[in-house]
Swiss-Prot record:
Gene3D superfamilies xrefs: NADH-ubiquinone/plastoquinone oxidoreductase chain 6, subunit NuoJ (1.20.120.1200)
Biological classification of the source: Eukaryota, Metazoa, Chordata, Craniata, Vertebrata
Native source species: Coturnix japonica
Gene Ontology CC terms: mitochondrial inner membrane; respiratory chain complex I
Keywords linked to the UniProt accession: Electron transport, Membrane, Mitochondrion, NAD, Respiratory chain, Translocase, Transmembrane, Transmembrane helix, Transport, Ubiquinone
Primary localization class, coarse: mitochondrion
Protein known as: NADH-ubiquinone oxidoreductase chain 6
Family to which the UniProt record says this protein belongs: Belongs to the complex I subunit 6 family.
EC number of the protein: 7.1.1.2
Role of this protein: Core subunit of the mitochondrial membrane respiratory chain NADH dehydrogenase (Complex I) that is believed to belong to the minimal assembly required for catalysis. Complex I functions in the transfer of electrons from NADH to the respiratory chain. The immediate electron acceptor for the enzyme is believed to be ubiquinone.
Transmembrane segments: 1-21, 27-47, 48-68, 87-107, 139-159
Amino acid sequence: MTYFVIFLGVCFMLGTLAVASNPSPYYGVVGLVLASVVGCGWLVNLGVSFVSLVLFMIYLGGMLVVFVYSVSLAADPYPEAWGSWRVMGYGLGFVLVVCMGMGLGGFVDFWKIGVTTVDSGGMSFVRLDFGGVAAFYSYGVGLFLVAGWGLLLVLFVVLELVRGLSRGAIRAV
C-alpha cells in the first residue's frame, strides 16, 4: 500500500509539473485533470472519500471552466508542444528544484517512508470521512461561498493574463 501511495505522489508531481510547464492552455488541462484525479485518489486511499469527491467536483468544475474560457479566448494558431526545448528546460528546472527541496528537507531516504491509511490501526478508529461530512454540512457553507467568489476572481485574472499588454490575443466575443 505504501508503494501505491508513493506512486500516486509521483503522479501528482508529474501532473503539477505538466500544469506548471505547459506552453499553452490547450495542454494545461491534461496536467490539471491528471493532478486532480491523482490527488483525489490519494485522499481516497487515506480514507476521506467524501471530501475527495467534493473537492474533485469543485476543483474540476471551477478550474476547467477557467481553462475553457482561456482556451476559447486565446488566439494561438500554432501552440508550442511539450516536446520543445524551452518546455523541456522548464520541466528540468522544476524537477531540479523539487529534488533540491527533497534533499535539503531530509526526505531522500525513501525506505523509511510510511503512510498510514484509515484501517492501518484496526477497525477501532473512527473514519475521518464521517467528520468531514458533518463539517461540510455545518461549517462549510461560508467556505463554499468564499471559494465560489474566489473562482470567479480567478476567472477574470486568467482572462486578463491571457489578454496580455494589448488586445492581441483576445478576440471579440
